[in-house]
Structures are given as C-alpha cells and as structure tokens.
Amino acid sequence: MQPCEPNKLFLTGPPGVGKSTIMRKAVDYAIKKGIKTIGFFTPDIRDNSYKRVGFDIEVLNYGNVPLARKNAEWNLRFGDYYINPEAKQAFQIVLRDIDFEKKDRKLIVIDEIGPMELMLEGSKEFFILILQQNVVPVIGVFHRKLSLTHPDLYRLIKKNIVYELSIQNREAVLMNIMKWIDSCYY
C-alpha cells in the first residue's frame, strides 16, 4: 500500500455487521496516535425497551443533534422517521473545523453517507466537497444502496479504498484500516 494513497477509505455492508463499531475502533486508534478526528457518527436512539425510535448525528468533539425520530413533527419524512431539517448544522460544524489548505494530523470521519443524511439541505454538497478534496484523509461508511440512489456520489467513493464488511472479515479490515492510518501520518 502506498503512503495514504488514496487518502480516503470507506466501509459498506449490510445492517448490523459492525461498520460503526469498526469505525469507532479506528477513531480510537487514531486518537491514541495523536491524530485529531473531525466528523460525525449517526447512532441510533432506542427507548427503554430497546426499540429504535430515531437517529442522532453525533458530531465529534461537540455533541449530538437529533437527525430523525419516529414521533416528531418535522416535515421531511423517510419511512417511519421524520427528519430534522436543523440537523444540517452538523455539517457546518464539521466544515468549520477542517482546514483544507494544510495537511496536518487530522482525520475526517463520516458515518454515514446514507439516505437520511442526504435528505438534509446542503448535505450532498458537503459530501462532494469532502470526497473531492485530497488534503485531509477520510474514513467513512456509505449506505449499501448508494450506487442506486446517488450514483454520482458512489462514483467518487469507488475511486478510493472500499471494504465490503462482513462478520467474517471485520477484524482483518480493522487491521488494514490501522495500517492505512499509519501510512497517512508516519
């Protein structure tokens, strides 16, 4: 593997296979190496009976913004969920922290590029900007059906390292991600 070539790495795969878990482990690894992580996760929100009731956008180093809820009064809708239009602020926070002019010890984290995130105003432009820049390394997750719903974004992603995650390969993929992170900063 060339040093950080390409400088973006993505995971995809079916629900529940461990994409976000692998991403969090990769972020922990980067932080231990002294790398500043900038970006977001999209954790699900569960009620007391462990039923999924929504999603947040968890902006690293800032906190959570509600993305979607089953019982909300927002106008945007995706399946059973209502989408919070104000969640677009999360992307503005992330952009504010990135300096595309200088390559320093930063890593952009995107979990995930999916249908709910793409419903937010300005989100597609945000993802295109992140995918087209070549200064700051990126690790991310994209929805497994992105090639069908947003082929333009998928074309940008597939130019990079892409792992189809499975239960069988997830530990090997994590090791490859750690090696890739090392190649980007050492």
Functional labels for PLM-detected ranges:
Residues 15:
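The conserved Walker
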Residues 22, 26:
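Hydrophobic positions on the alpha1 helix immediately C-terminal to the Walker A/P-loop
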Residues 28-78:
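N-terminal phosphate/diphosphate-binding loop that engages ATP/GTP or pyrophosphate donors
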Residues 11:
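Hydrophobic anchor at the beta1->P-loop junction of P-loop NTPases
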Residues 74-128:
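Phosphate-binding/switch loop-helix module in NTP-utilizing enzymes
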Residues 19:
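Conserved lysine of the Walker
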Residues 8:
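Walker A (P-loop) ATP-phosphate-binding motif of ABC ATPase nucleotide-binding domains
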